[in-house]
């Protein structure tokens, strides 16, 4: 049974490889990123910019790699989950990095104003 599952996982990886984007920069939890998202409105498509802090990241080297981004939209905090290898994402740009000590930053949901800021790392 185990031999079949390893063959199946190898087959799945070989199928996924052509669809994985290679030009995505290294993104860590705590980074402030900006990404372009293609949005279809009726018959038109436009690029929508989304900028925010990465709260969580799942499956680092897979086709299903996703990240949770917390943006502020008209003064209200909004969390969105993006699949990095989605064809709707046009670009990803790291704006600033932060020093963190947690794997997931879900505690930022409850903090407002200055309390919700992260300590910036200067390279």
Swiss-Prot record:
| SUPFAM superfamilies in alphabetical order | Translation proteins SH3-like domain (SSF50104)
Q: Where is the signal peptide?
A: none
Do you know which Gene3D superfamilies this protein is assigned to? 2.30.30.790
A cellular-component GO term for this protein: chloroplast
Primary localization class, coarse = plastid
Q: Where in the cell is it found?
A: Plastid, Chloroplast
**Which GO MF terms are attached to this record?**
structural constituent of ribosome
Q: Which UniProt keywords apply?
A: Chloroplast, Plastid, Ribonucleoprotein, Ribosomal protein
A Gene Ontology biological process noted in the UniProt record is:
translation
Q: Which HAMAP family match?
A: Ribosomal_bL19
Similarity section: Belongs to the bacterial ribosomal protein bL19 family.
Q: Write down what this protein is called.
A: Large ribosomal subunit protein bL19c
């Amino acid at each position: 049974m185990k031999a079949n599952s390893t063959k199946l996982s190898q087959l799945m990886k070989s199928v996924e490889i052509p669809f994985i984007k290679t030009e995505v920069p290294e993104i860590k939890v705590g980074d402030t990123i900006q990404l372009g998202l293609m949005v279809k409105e009726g018959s038109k498509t436009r690029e929508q910019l989304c900028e925010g802090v990465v709260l969580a990241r799942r499956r680092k080297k897979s086709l299903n790699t996703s990240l949770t981004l917390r943006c502020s939209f008209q003064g209200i905090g909004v969390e969105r989950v993006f699949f990095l290898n989605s064809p709707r994402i046009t670009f990803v740009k790291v704006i600033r990095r932060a020093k963190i000590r947690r794997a997931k930053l879900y505690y930022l949901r409850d903090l407002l104003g200055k309390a919700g800021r992260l300590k910036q790392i200067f390279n």
